[in-house]
Amino acid sequence: MASGCKIGPSILNSDLANLGAECLRMLDSGADYLHLDVMDGHFVPNITFGHPVVESLRKQLGQDPFFDMHMMVSRPEQWVKPMAVAGANQYTFHLEATENPGALIKDIRENGMKVGLAIKPGTTVEYLAPWANQIDMALVMTVEPGFGGQKFMEDMMPKVHWLRTQFPTLDIEVDGGVGPDTVQKCAEAGANMIVSGSAIMRSDDPRAVINLLRNVCSEAAQKRSLDR
């Protein structure tokens, strides 16, 4: 079985001048993990932060929070060890960014991290299939990666459904434009890891939003198990 429904706030939409406090606010509001977007200005047209920030967050937040690193970088091989040393728990790289996913998966595992594999909206989901049994999580982007606050792409849901059908025990994450108005579609398609940025970060009651997202996801998962 997949690991259950989990909600990971994307800190891309947080007050970056108070990043540690923002992460604590999310964890105190019931977040299951933190989704950390690393962008290099090459793979995507934006720059965020790198492993020194991750190391600082780990020192401030302690060992318990799970850091899911979304590596939107053109050379994901370069940052495996630095991210592992900094305290990352999962290294999610883009299939489009490497010519040798197998070697990269092996390197990530040897550095003690879980493996996530992401695909952009324009990438055919079947290209991910050869690696599905070697990874811990598949990430289906529901916006073009690079910036927060974009409109959710509902036409990505068949990819999620295909992955859930073909690989029923795989963790499947969705990222981009996901919030209370769109999570139902994601959950019904089969996603069990929900990344949400603006909807949580900009809410007056982030705990309520996180609980709503988790409840919708859990109910859909329960219905799928009953329908089998």
UniProtKB/Swiss-Prot annotation:
Record-annotated active site: D37, D175
GO cellular component, one term: cytosol
Sorted UniProt keywords: Acetylation, Carbohydrate metabolism, Cobalt, Iron, Isomerase, Manganese, Metal-binding, Zinc
Top-level EC class: isomerase
Pfam families: Ribul_P_3_epim
Catalyses which reaction(s): D-ribulose 5-phosphate = D-xylulose 5-phosphate
Binding site residues for substrate: S10, H70, G146, F147, G148, G149, D175, G176, G177, G197, S198
EC annotation from Swiss-Prot or TrEMBL: 5.1.3.1
Cofactor note: Binds 1 divalent metal cation per subunit. Active with Fe(2+), and probably also with Mn(2+), Zn(2+) and Co(2+).
Reported cofactor(s): Fe(2+); Mn(2+); Zn(2+); Co(2+)
Listed pathway(s): Carbohydrate degradation
Modified residues (N-acetylalanine): A2
One annotated GO biological process: pentose-phosphate shunt, non-oxidative branch
Binding site for a divalent metal cation: H35, D37, H70, D175
Gene3D superfamilies for this protein: Aldolase class I
MF term (GO), any: D-ribulose-phosphate 3-epimerase activity
CDD domains: RPE
SUPFAM superfamilies: Ribulose-phoshate binding barrel (SSF51366)
Assigned protein family: Belongs to the ribulose-phosphate 3-epimerase family.
Function: Catalyzes the reversible epimerization of D-ribulose 5-phosphate to D-xylulose 5-phosphate.
Subunit record text: Homodimer.
Protein name, entry field: Ribulose-phosphate 3-epimerase
Organism of provenance: Mus musculus
Gene: Rpe
